[in-house]
Amino acid sequence: RGARRARPALRARGKRLSHEPFEDSRRLTGANLYFDGAGAALETAAGLAFDAGALQRWRANVERARALLGWSETVVVVREHATGASLAFEAPFDQLYVAAEMNEWALYSALGLRASDKPVHDDDAKPPRPHVAHFDDDEALHQLQALAAMEAKPNLRALVAAARERGVPAHADDDVLSIGEGLAAQAWPLDALPDIDAVPWSQLHAIPKAVVTGSNGKTTTVRLLAAMLRAH
């Protein structure tokens, strides 16, 4: 599971380049191929020239920023492969946009590059702003701190933690928190979340479910299972 981010343009030594140093930057909104949790993942662009030192700097930049934001005690995964490398790390589920931008900055900085001043495609940015990788490292880290504080939703985290303590599923996207499943679920807009004591916990619970994964045949399999259950 993941959600793509718009990619900033690249600038190196004052020159605008035609490509970015990565080909995919994602928010990981749940369990994924790296770890069982939320976070961010970045894949280097095919053919990008980098060495072991750049890879170490990339990870070190991520660790530095995570420590600054208090995310130190979480997983970081680095994978090298034939065409490049990927780096993924766990992050608070309510701060995944800043996590993705942090990962992008960490790679830019590791390569000695900067993003252009093209505004980030962020509906919440008021006014539109450049990517943090447009600035020097100290300013980038300062901006990441501010962005994390703006994105954080402590009341959302508290509700999800309360649901987990009670063994009730809770799922949040960019707009809504739902607690429970199926007919035994209730949803709230993120800008109108209830107090923990106002949630009707006794009415909310999980339901039996089947998960279908794979690259081909998922829809057909789900339709087949649904038909079998209806006929049962």
Q: PLM features: residue spans?
A:
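Short Lys/Arg-enriched alpha/beta "domain-start" segment
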Residues: 1-71
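N-terminal accessory interaction module
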Residues: 45-123, 144-147
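Long, low-complexity repeat tracts used as extracellular stalks/passenger repeats
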Residues: 87, 132-134
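Metal- or metallocofactor-binding catalytic centers and their adjacent structured scaffolds
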Residues: 125-128
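A short, surface-exposed helix-loop junction/capping segment
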Residues: 135-150
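N-terminal donor/sugar-recognition subdomains of glycan-related enzymes
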Residues: 151-152, 191
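Charged, amphipathic alpha-helical linker segments immediately N-terminal to NTP-binding catalytic cores
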Residues: 152-185
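Phosphate-binding loop of NTP-binding sites
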Residues: 177-183, 190, 194-232
